Amino acid sequence: MTSYPSSIADSFEDIKLRTITYPQDDFVSWYLPAAEVAAVFARGHLPYITLPDIRDVRPRIAVILAQEKHPARDEKDYSLHPDYASAIVASGGFPVFIAYDKVVEQLANTKPDGVLLIGGCFNSPRDWYLEPPVEDKDKRAQAYLQMLDYARQNHLPTLGICAGEQIIGGSLGAKLRRDINRDCDVAQSHKQGGYVLAHKVKVLPDTLLAQVVKKSELLVNTAHNEAIDNLHLGQCRIAALADDDTVEAIEPLAPWHKFVLGVQWHPERLLKLGDEASRQIFKTFVKVAADEL
């Protein structure tokens, strides 16, 4: 039985993510047809989107869903790579998933204890880029920004991964580089896949990241085209660098909570491989959200 997070349970409709293997993938994803979620909003309710067969406990970690195209449907599905959910659950958290409409209302009523900004392909605000693209921010990016504002206002622990790291940085005035792989050979590329241990990163001392992983160097995966520019950091500081000086992790100069961290690699996938640093990142994030640290 679902334990709703507020006294206004009548405003919620309980929705469970389902599994699917998209034709272009070799793994099973979580998904929901977008039309199903839109119908909940049309009825004047809010979706309470969770995993099946997982008990609702604290801490709740809010996650904006991704999108994926299924050939049988005109509109993109809401989707989620399974490793994000698994990392939260394995670390003792309860993931609650947020759709792109009425983001603030969903968050205010689910009352998360922390927020996770996941990676993915979407359009960030064009004025964040050193070389602005034609397209401006899309609906997914707008949802991320709304959730990030909610986290700031409510002083919630925040973890950003890949594009989520860039959202944290861009919102604090950092500039983005659009195609960091343009001048790289294959061996240097930052887009080698989620489970490939591709390159080392140097963890800078006296940072939250150094405190969490307790290492000065990490071996990480890499799957990105964009990155925060080293010379335009806004109100952020660098927490980790690749050998080619690509920014690999950032932290705000004035964090709204003692745990606010963005990493460019994908610790949720390395956690699946048993990586200890990745385990510590998620474990610390979830424990802080539970007020246990």
Put a short name on every predicted segment.
Residues 222:
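Short, basic/aromatic recognition patches
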Residues 163-165, 172:
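Active-site loop->helix "elbow" adjoining a glycine-rich segment at hydrolase catalytic centers
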Residues 261-264:
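Active-site-proximal beta-strand elements of phosphoester/diester hydrolases
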Residues 2-159, 170, 177, 181-212, ...:
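N-terminal beta1-alpha1 cap of cysteine-dependent amidohydrolase-like domains
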